[in-house]
A protein has these predicted regions:
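An aromatic- and histidine-rich active-site surface loop
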Residues: 10-35
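Nucleotide-sugar donor phosphate/pyrophosphate-binding loop at the beta->alpha transition
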Residues: 31-41, 46-63
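Conserved donor-binding/catalytic core segment of Leloir-type glycosyltransferases
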Residues: 72, 118-135, 141-144, 156
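Carbohydrate-associated surface elements
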Residues: 77, 98
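A short helix/loop element that forms part of the nucleotide-sugar donor recognition site in Leloir-type
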Residues: 104-119
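Aromatic "clamp/platform" in nucleotide-sugar-dependent glycosyltransferases that forms part
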Residues: 185, 204
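A short hydrophobic beta-strand element within the catalytic core of glycosyltransferases
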Residues: 199-200
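Short glycine/serine-rich donor-binding loops of glycosyltransferases
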Residues: 209-212
């Protein structure tokens, strides 16, 4: 209905599972009504290496990728993983993630906001992720534990996910709960990174590492 209402000319779906499969179904429904619309599928990482590689989902992922008109990957390594793990007949084009620099400018009021989180002599260490096991959240806490033994510092944990409670418990066990601030999900990543002194991303694996970008 959205395609017909807004006269959409292209379906660009992100993640092979479930969106590519849903996109294919929508494309077939439109085809039955005489509407032909191409579909581009962009692969991001966990849809291939984690969720998509599960035996239950693998046939559907393979099918939906092969039925896409164009397939893109956010990195060369993810492309290689895709071709290794699935029987893909389509060409996979690598188009890295990017940002628009004009939209990411440091604001003049940064010092004011920084002072709310840390004193002038404290360093700010920042981690941003979806708090899943692959992000090695306990290691982030342990790394900071060693850092704060040598220098005065605060740790900002930005994001949310299944490993958050474990991280909070570890902070309490190590006696650093007063030095770690859990900010949850935020729309002010630019501002947070602008007053950070160090960004930590010790992931087990990353298809691209969007948080680092």
């Amino acid at each position: 209905d959205m395609v017909k209402l807004y006269k959409i000319e292209l379906l660009h779906v992100h993640y092979a599972i479930p969106h590519a499969y849903a996109g294919y179904m929508a494309k077939q429904m439109l085809k039955d009504e005489g509407i032909k619309i191409p579909m581009v599928t962009t692969l991001h990482g966990t849809d291939i290496t984690l969720v998509g590689n599960h035996p239950f989902y693998k046939p559907a992922v393979t099918f939906s990728i092969n039925k896409s008109d164009v397939v893109t990957s956010v990195s060369q390594s993810l492309k290689e993983d895709t071709l290794k793990l699935f029987d893909i007949k389509k060409e996979v084009v690598v188009i890295p993630n990017f940002i628009e620099l004009d939209n990411h400018k440091i604001e003049a009021d940064i010092p004011c906001y920084r002072s709310v989180l840390a004193s002038e002599n404290e360093r700010i260490i920042t981690h941003i992720s979806n708090f899943r096991k692959v992000k090695r959240i306990p290691d982030v806490i342990k790394i900071f534990y060693k850092i704060q033994q040598s220098i005065s510092a605060k740790l900002l944990m930005v994001g949310d996910g299944p490993e958050k409670e474990r991280a909070e418990n570890l902070c309490n066990e190590l006696g650093i709960a007063d030095k770690v601030i859990f900010l949850g999900n935020s729309n002010e990543i630019d501002r947070i990174l602008s007053y950070s002194d160090l960004f930590l991303l010790p992931s087990e694996t990353e298809s691209f590492g969007l948080a680092a970008l």
